[in-house]
């Protein structure tokens, strides 16, 4: 294009260089090239050939330059169009990418919105769960606070009961230190016993009846008859038999009349008797009649109770346990193996189960002298030494009694004797029935109740049992070594039957600080059995005291 433009310029220059020659020859100069379209034909005819050629060359050069410019412009436009098209393509690509990004962002927004909705739902559920959990926790905390308050109330009751037990223990220590062994305490009220004096046949009191003396056993009961016959003292056996009256023989534990009365009573009254005697029954137990206090028999001297009950002297326990007969063991609720273990001393495995103490502990509680060990060994082996010694002690106790003392025994004390023997028969019968019944009421306890008119009901079961022991130990504690084997430790504090090996648990040495607990247990069992036998059979109450017995029905 530049070459064409150069050629056109050269042609134009050549035309100009040639034009002055004819111009000088012509009259009128030629018009410019631009004016050719305006020049008329007549004027063109007047021009010369050179002028026409120059005008034509000029017009052609102009046209060529215009065409070149136009082509240049077209090329420039095309180039610009190409650039614009490239930009458009790039923008299209960018737009496509942006659209893809926009779609991705939309999808992401939808996903995030779904997550937000899910988060809202989860937050609502979490708040609902939190409110429900807070309510449940509030209820649980309130329940546990109530339980905690109940436990605190129970703990306060236990603390009060423990304080009462401590006061009772202090009272027991004071009473033991004061030496209250002289006041005799009976199972029934003294008024009932005084009214029984006229109805009881007057005969010499048996020293070994087990009521309140420190003798070694009831010589008038059939099981002790066999015991003395086997121990080689027939003289002592015949003496109380000849002294007994027909009424006395009717009240004996081996008579066929009395055991039929308790059988008619049945066992449903027995749980009531487990609650212990009533407060009216407790009142006369702690008071001895003036006649009893003025005429204490040899077995109720102040030396007897500390030696044989409180001090844990096991001489009477060992003699009585070691010389037990088969009938005695059978009434106590044992099999032949039970009898053999019970008669020969056995092992020390019983009292730890019934009371929770170890054999060494009980061995320390009941420490005996060498005479006690010797007497227990001879009685356990079936020799005649223990029985002869028992017979000698009983004969001395009967021969040393003055006529006035015998009259006292023939009156009030004989009623206690017959009453205790009938209670023994009842206890034997209950033990025979207990062996055939399931022991479902072993852990039955009386819940503590409050009553301003009755101090006993405000205490716990343990405090009531200790109170029952204390009210019964002053009248029954001195006769504990003389009671049959069915009374002593035949059931634990929880009602479980004792092992036949408990006889051997009374050997050993005891310190004064370790003595009271097994003695408390023994006297408590005796007291519960006596109250059980008296309360569960109204026939004994009607027959003896004329419906004046104040024990539990």
Curated annotation (Swiss-Prot):
Keyword Chloroplast carried by entry: no
Sequence segments annotated as region (Disordered): 1-37, 203-414, 433-461, 491-518
Protein name: Coiled-coil domain-containing protein 85A
Chain positions with Asymmetric dimethylarginine modification: 541
Subcellular location field: Cell junction, Adherens junction
Subunit structure: May interact with ARVCF; CTNND1; CTNND2 and PKP4.
Main location: other
Described purpose of this protein according to its UniProt entry: May play a role in cell-cell adhesion and epithelium development through its interaction with proteins of the beta-catenin family.
Compositionally biased residues, Basic and acidic residues: 236-260, 391-403
Highest taxon in the source lineage: Eukaryota
Organism: Homo sapiens
CC per GO annotation: adherens junction
Primary gene name: CCDC85A
Keywords of this entry: Cell junction, Coiled coil, Methylation
UniProt cross-references to InterPro entries, sorted A to Z: CCDC85
